[in-house]
């Protein structure tokens, strides 16, 4: 890299030596004709002309002089910045904050929304979902339905299916010779990886026997993800053919997938894949007994999503007709075909991230405007210096180049600080994405992010430097040289430019602060929503156990009940309860039918079936959460496996069932519960509504099932279906009980020590979801924008007062009142504030709908929020203006005149 520069330097030396040789020859010739040495040298120089100019012209002909001049400008810019460290640090920190926000948000958007999927032609992959008449998606697609699609669809190819055992949050246990690790186990059709267009990095994938079925020889084989191969087996190259166990069942490793390849992408744990073997249950069409699978396919050549959806809907009408039960037909009556990449991120999350990205871009613009104002002031102060350079022959282009390079040096330094700040921000962002958006990803700057950072660095340098450079370079030279000082060489144009920049800062800051205010009001509203239960002094533990170790056993009798008994006797524990779902968690929704107690469907109710949230609990849950009973009773110790099955519903359930005012006492049931002798349960109590899916979500119909009454064969609280949690109300800080609770759970089953422990207050905090994360980020963005805005107002007014020191001194000497001088400065500030606030209100009104999807209980154009933000900015701006105003009023006329 240094060779061209060394060659250029050598050419310069050779040119200088040649010119000096010509000069010596001319001198020698004149001295031979009788001239003295001094006269000969003077005449020879006059004859040759301007030697430095000859060197410059010759070097320009070589074409490398531009690099020399750039390096000169870089060295000069560094010297100038060292002479003004306060200015350099202020500009660098300001710009680094804007760059950090922009880079951090782009990294998040890139990883979550823009990253290319690790599959061939991922844009043609589609997800197929059976839908009910109510517009709700079903539990998945039945094997026979998928087989029908495979046989009849022409616009979809490679229809494949899969299922993640126990759901996305469930852990399976992979055991090798010397390892045991929790994994997500996906059961997949043999053609899945062919549909995805992915080959194994080592070994092979499953062999297909037709219609996605696996060949018999691959019935007990397994594929490992790259992460599992490296972490659990130390990247052993001899892994192929080795025997491993998943939940106690033996499999032979036949392949390792490439690094970065995962499917489904929404899982938090490393993956293994085993082939799906159709069972007898797959050969029937019933919603409750038939296994259901997620389905993915690839669009045929030339087919569109709309065309595929139309074709699949026609097929689905025939499929639905093959279900004998009307309820089953109603729940699969239509079909939805969606691009797979669009299913990975919820639409509300997508809009939230894009809104936050826009807010970060606005903050970056504010930082650029602030630095532009600083550079304009600095360039104006250096106007006489620049005029001298112009008078000595520097072209306008060279002056602009020098100022641009100075801006680029500042921007480059700011980018280095910005990438560090962005990396620190991303570490905190990962937790928020997981807990409040439900997205599991590792956030780190990649090559695309670094390219964007480089682009933003250059744009920042140009955006903040071009305007000041052109404004100063175009200024006439003679007036600047004639003035005695730099202070008196400024013009009205530069003042107007800086005032316009401050107005833009105020407008953009108000827009950000309005969005921040709307979200803060949203969080305030959500914090005051009645939850329907108490959260203080309550902690919960979500239990994770190896499912295969409790197969064919009474899980409640052998594990849960003894564990609950020991927990209830811990010091400081008031009460404890088991539950399949924690309030504000992901509740399980099923359909209940109403009966007359003899297994027959009732006909005297307003509706014969109802879709409701279902949760199995022990009687002590009422003491833990203190739900409000409206009618009847809650479960007690008399509700056992041999007594009449009982359930408790909420107010919304009654409202949907028979309307307000109905009394409990009706029978209802569902095949899922597995009550003894298939008895239907009777409703014995009505609870007040509570929040289930989230604070911002309305209450749904809910039913509580008495856990001791569920038979051992039921899948309701089985280890491979719905997770089990234990809730504990304590007399002291719940966090202090965790070590003792963990020890009790370890004694019950060693794997329970790895359960997730948290307090209900933290569960509530996490349930604020995207609003919480967005409000925190906008608090940072808005606060930074407010500081930069106030700093911009102060900087401009302080600069104007400094520039007008002589004028102010003369005014005071001529009798001007100091109060009027203060008012003059405050009037200037007020004019900028009014213009900026008016523009900002228009922008805020136009853009506030962008955050509308994040709001709860607040309108996007909330007048109180806009008024409060306007008042805050107005008061902050006037406070910033008071300091320069007092300085203007305190000018000593004698000192001001003497300084000139």
Residues covered by each model-derived region:
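Membrane-helix entry/capping segments
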Residues: 44-87, 119-120, 167, 179, ...
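Alpha-helical transmembrane segments of integral membrane proteins
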Residues: 57-89, 340-346, 374-401, 405, ...
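Short, strongly hydrophobic transmembrane alpha-helices
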Residues: 85-112, 116, 367-368, 411-416, ...
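Alpha-helical transmembrane segments
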Residues: 97-124, 425-434, 508-537, 566, ...
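Small-residue-rich transmembrane alpha-helices
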Residues: 105-108, 372, 408-480, 518-521, ...
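Interfacial "coupling" helices/loops that link adjacent transmembrane helices in transporter permeases
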Residues: 367-411, 791-833, 837, 850, ...
């Amino acid at each position: 890299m240094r060779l061209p520069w060394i060659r250029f330097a050598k050419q310069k030396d050779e040119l200088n030596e040649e010119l000096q040789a010509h000069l010596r020859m001319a001198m020698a010739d004149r001295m031979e004709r009788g001239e003295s040495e001094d006269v000969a040298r003077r005449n020879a120089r006059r004859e040759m002309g301007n030697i430095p100019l000859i060197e410059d012209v010759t070097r320009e002909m070589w074409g490398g002089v531009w690099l020399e001049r750039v390096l000169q400008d870089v060295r000069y810019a560094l010297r100038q910045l060292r002479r003004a460290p306060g200015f350099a640090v202020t500009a660098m920190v300001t710009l680094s904050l804007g760059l950090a926000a922009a880079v951090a948000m782009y990294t998040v958007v890139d990883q979550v929304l823009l990253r290319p999927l690790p599959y061939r032609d991922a844009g043609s992959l589609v997800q197929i979902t059976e839908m009910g008449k109510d517009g709700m998606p079903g539990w998945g697609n039945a094997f026979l339905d998928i087989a029908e699609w495979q046989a009849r669809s022409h616009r979809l190819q490679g229809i494949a299916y899969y299922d993640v055992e126990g759901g996305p949050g469930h852990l399976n246990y992979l055991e090798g010779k010397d390892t045991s690790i929790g994994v997500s186990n996906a059961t997949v059709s043999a053609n899945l990886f062919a549909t995805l267009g992915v080959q194994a990095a080592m070994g092979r994938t499953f062999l297909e026997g037709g219609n996605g079925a696996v060949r018999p020889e691959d019935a007990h084989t397994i594929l490992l993800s790259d992460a599992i191969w490296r972490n659990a087996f130390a990247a052993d190259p001899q892994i192929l053919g080795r025997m491993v166990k998943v939940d106690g069942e033996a499999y032979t490793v036949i392949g390792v997938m490439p690094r970065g390849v995962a499917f489904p992408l929404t899982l938090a744990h490393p993956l293994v894949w085993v082939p799906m073997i159709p069972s007898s249950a797959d050969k029937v069409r019933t919603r409750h007994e038939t296994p259901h699978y997620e389905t993915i396919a690839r669009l045929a050549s030339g087919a569109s999503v709309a065309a595929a959806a139309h074709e699949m809907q026609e097929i689905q009408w025939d499929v639905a007709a093959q279900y004998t039960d009307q309820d089953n037909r109603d729940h699969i009556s239509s079909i939805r075909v969606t691009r797979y990449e669009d299913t990975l991120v919820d639409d509300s999350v997508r809009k939230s991230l894009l809104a936050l990205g826009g807010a970060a871009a606005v903050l970056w613009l504010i930082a650029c405007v602030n630095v532009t104002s600083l550079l304009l002031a600095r360039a104006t102060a250096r106007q006489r210096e620049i005029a001298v350079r112009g008078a000595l022959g520097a072209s306008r282009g060279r002056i602009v180049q020098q100022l641009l390079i100075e801006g680029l040096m500042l921007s480059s330094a700011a980018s280095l600080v910005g990438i560090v700040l962005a990396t620190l921000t991303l570490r905190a962002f990962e937790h928020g994405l997981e807990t409040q958006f439900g997205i599991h990803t590792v956030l780190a700057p990649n090559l695309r992010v670094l390219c964007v950072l480089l682009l933003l660095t250059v744009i920042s340098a140009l955006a903040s430097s071009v305007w000041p450079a052109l404004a100063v370079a175009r200024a006439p030279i003679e007036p600047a040289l004639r003035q005695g000082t730099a202070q008196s060489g400024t013009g009205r144009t530069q003042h107007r430019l800086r005032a316009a920049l401050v107005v833009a800062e105020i407008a953009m800051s108000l827009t950000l602060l309005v969005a921040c205010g709307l979200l803060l009001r949203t969080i305030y509203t959500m914090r005051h929503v009645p939850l329907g239960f108490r959260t203080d002094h309550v902690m919960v533990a979500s239990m994770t156990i190896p499912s295969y170790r409790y197969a064919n056993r009474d899980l409640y009798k052998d594990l849960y009940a003894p564990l609950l008994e020991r927990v209830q006797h811990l010091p400081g524990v008031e009460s404890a309860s088991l539950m399949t779902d924690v309030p504000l968690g992901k509740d399980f929704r099923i359909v209940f039918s109403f009966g007359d107690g003899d297994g027959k469907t009732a006909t005297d109710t307003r509706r014969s079936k109802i879709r409701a949230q279902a949760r199995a609990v022990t009687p002590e849950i009422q003491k833990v959460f203190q739900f409000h009973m409206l009618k009847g009773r809650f479960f007690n110790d008399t509700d056992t496996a041999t007594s009449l099955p009982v359930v408790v519903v909420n107010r919304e359930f009654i409202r949907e069932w028979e309307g307000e005012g109905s009394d409990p006492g009706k029978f209802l049931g569902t095949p899922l519960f597995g009550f003894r002798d298939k008895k239907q349960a009777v409703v014995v109590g009505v609870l007040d509504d509570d929040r289930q899916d989230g604070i911002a979500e309305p209450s749904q119909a809910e039913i509580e099932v008495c856990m001791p009454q569920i038979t051992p064969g039921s899948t309701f609280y089985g280890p491979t279906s719905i997770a089990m949690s234990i809730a504990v109300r304590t007399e002291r800080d719940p966090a202090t009980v965790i070590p003792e609770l963990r020890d009790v759970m370890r004694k019950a089953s060693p794997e329970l020590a790895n359960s997730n422990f948290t307090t209900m207050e933290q569960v509530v905090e996490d349930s604020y979801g995207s609003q919480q994360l967005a409000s925190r980020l906008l608090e940072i963005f808005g606060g930074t924008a407010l500081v930069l805005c106030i700093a911009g107002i102060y900087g401009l007014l302080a600069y104007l007062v400094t520039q007008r020191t002589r004028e102010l001194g003369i005014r005071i000497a001529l009798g001007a009142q100091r109060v009027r001088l203060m008012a003059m400065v405050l009037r200037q500030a007020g004019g900028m504030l009014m213009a900026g606030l008016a523009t900002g209100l228009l922008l805020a009104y136009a853009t506030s709908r962008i955050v509308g999807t994040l709001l709860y209980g607040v309108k996007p154009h909330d007048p109180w929020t806009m008024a409060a933000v306007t008042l805050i900015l107005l008061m902050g701006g006037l406070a910033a203006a008071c300091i320069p105003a007092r300085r203007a009023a305190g000018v000593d006329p004698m000192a001001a005149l003497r300084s000139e």
